[in-house]
Regions:
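Short hydrophobic targeting helices and cationic amphipathic motifs
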Residues: 18-20, 294
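Short, charge-rich patches within N-terminal targeting peptides
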Residues: 8-14
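Short hydrophobic alpha-helical segments enriched in small aliphatic residues
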Residues: 4, 20-23, 30
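Catalytic or ion-coupling anion/metal-binding cores of large enzyme and transporter domains
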Residues: 48-96, 100-102, 107-126, 133-134, ...
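Short, Lys/Arg-enriched N-terminal segments with co-localized hydrophobic residues
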Residues: 26, 30-46
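A short, small-residue-rich loop immediately preceding and capping a beta-strand
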Residues: 158-180, 191-195
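Aromatic/His-enriched, Gly/Pro-containing loop or helix-boundary segments
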Residues: 141-165
């Protein structure tokens, strides 16, 4: 629904109605039904009269003393009816830093349309994000982890400062996903999370490739195994569309978490960013948040100890990012839940690894979506006894109720049954010992060698380690240790993807260890 520009105050606003895009194709692939209802049905909310006397926005819109505030709203073309409705903050992490975020603005407009259609007044704003793919391998990466806190803080301040009643958060790149979910839990206003979608895979020499292949190609190039022309050809085709990194890196890991934990609509995390069906999910999210206001369902009603355990289970089952072990305790902290690193690791230890996703496996997010998506993954884990089905979600129903009509698709190769997992324990594990008394996290998805002993080779920053790797100044059997790169020491806890990928690119991934 597209609303024309408002006329002068008091005049009736002209409205033009357009049919929503046909999204049926996004729910069926061949004979496999991925969802039992279109997304607009999932988020449907009856037209509701809201009592603003109990909502935060009453402080900026109700009573004669708020006439100056209302004059600002009239200046933006708002009508008396819109001022009298609940105010919903629609926040996106849109920017032009990287493809991860450029589809968010489009989806935010659809979310606003959903809010409007369900008797709400959307108020759009943006916050920052730092894109790891651009920040990686240099001083810029020190900005990444702290950006999570800045995102949460900035959203909190904007929501509180303007007395918004509810929130829809749209995120694309790594730290922005937990940042927005942390803000939702801190504010505890009715909220729906919306992932912006993953990138399409590129194609190089007849094979699907992602940006990780380019990182690894840097190592191959340094070793003299890839000429300049081939490296350039790969970099030009690896990232063909908008969207976040296609493998099960931080963005897709936390997108899966958003569904597992109950803050996102079912199946909304799966469709790639270019798909028009994302707009339908965004519109449904707008309607869903109005339903949450009407029923006073808040993030801390949804995110409980049980739902946090569900989230950790999904991280392990998908061979997800080790960052999940950082973000889940931070989210739990915002909700007042005790859920630390080693408690997360205990769940990792008893969860089967069943999703064959890059970087440890073969497939990307688009493939899992077409195979059955996050709902099929969740149903598989639920039936295996690995999830709590009684957790509330943003649909107003429990996780088990959302999954009632989902069945396992045997004609796909991405998601394995729990009775025949890729490995019996999770793709991410926690360790504790003399080397790391407070605990450590290791991504073991795709690794064959789980024990290593060697000579320590110490570096005091990432740049020194990468330079040594680039000139192959190390040998098989070394344990490469990069010191002073923690949250305080760095500061910022930079991720060592450039160094890790270069080692793999040189063919030495199983010959050295990296700490």
């Amino acid at each position: 629904r597209v609303h024309g520009a408002a006329n002068k105050a008091g005049q009736k606003k002209q409205k033009m109605d357009f049919h929503s895009p046909d999204v049926a194709d996004s729910f069926s692939h061949g004979s496999i039904i991925l969802a039992t209802k279109p997304p607009e049905a999932i988020g449907r909310c009856a037209m509701t009269e809201f009592d603003k006397s109990k909502l935060p926005s009453r402080h900026v819109s109700v009573g004669p003393e708020r006439a100056p505030h209302r004059s600002y709203y009239y200046a933006m073309g708002m009508t008396e009816e819109e001022i009298a409705q609940p105010f919903v903050g629609v926040v996106s992490c849109w920017n032009e830093a990287a493809p991860c975020n450029i589809a968010l603005m489009r989806q935010a407009q659809a979310a606003k349309a959903g809010v409007k259609s369900a008797s709400g007044t959307p108020r759009e704003f943006c916050t920052i994000t730092v894109t790891d793919g651009i920040a990686m391998g240099h001083e810029g990466m020190k900005s990444s982890l702290i950006s999570r806190e800045v995102i949460a803080d900035s959203v909190e301040l904007t929501m509180r400062g303007h007395c918004y009643d509810a929130m829809i958060g749209l995120a694309g790149c790594d730290k922005s996903l937990p940042g927005l979910m942390m803000a939702m839990l801190r504010l505890n206003v009715p909220s729906v999370f919306m992932y912006g979608g993953s990138i399409m895979p590129g194609e190089f020499k007849g094979k699907d490739v992602t940006v990780l292949d380019v990182f690894e190609a840097v190592g191959q190039h340094a070793a003299g195994n890839m000429p300049d022309e081939e490296l350039h050809e790969l970099e030009c085709v690896a990232c063909p569309s908008a969207g976040a990194c296609g493998g099960q890196f931080t963005a897709n890991t936390m997108a899966c978490v958003s569904e597992a934990i109950g803050l996102a609509l079912p199946n909304s995390a799966g469709a790639p960013a270019p798909y028009e069906s994302r707009d339908a999910y965004a519109e449904a999210s707008g309607k869903a948040v109005m339903n949450l206001i009407a029923n006073n369902i808040r993030p801390r009603d949804i995110v409980t100890r049980k739902s946090m355990e569900n989230a950790a289970t999904v991280v392990a089952a998908t061979g997800g990012s080790t960052n999940g072990a950082l973000h889940l305790p931070a989210m739990a902290h915002e909700a007042g839940i005790d859920f630390d690193l080693m408690q997360v690791a205990e769940i990792f230890k008893k969860t089967p690894y069943i999703a064959d996703l890059k970087p440890g496996g073969q497939y990307v997010a688009k493939d899992m979506y077409e195979a059955g998506g996050v709902p099929m993954l969740l149903k598989t884990l639920l039936e295996g006894g690995y999830l709590h089905g009684d957790c509330l979600t943003v649909t107003g129903k429990t996780l088990a109720e959302n999954l009632e009509e989902i069945t396992f698709n045997p004609d796909q190769k991405v998601i394995y049954p729990v009775s025949n997992p890729i490995t019996p324990t999770g793709g991410v594990v926690g360790l504790k010992g003399s080397l790391a008394p407070d605990g450590a996290i290791v991504k073991v998805a795709g690794m064959e060698k789980l024990q290593f002993e060697g000579t320590a080779r110490c570096f005091d920053c990432e740049e020194d380690a990468f330079a040594a790797v680039e000139r192959e100044d190390y040998k098989a059997g070394d344990v490469i240790i990069i010191r002073y790169e923690g949250p305080k020491g760095g500061p910022g806890m930079r991720e060592m993807l450039s160094t890790t990928s270069a080692i793999y690119g040189q063919g030495n991934g199983d010959k050295v260890a990296l700490i």
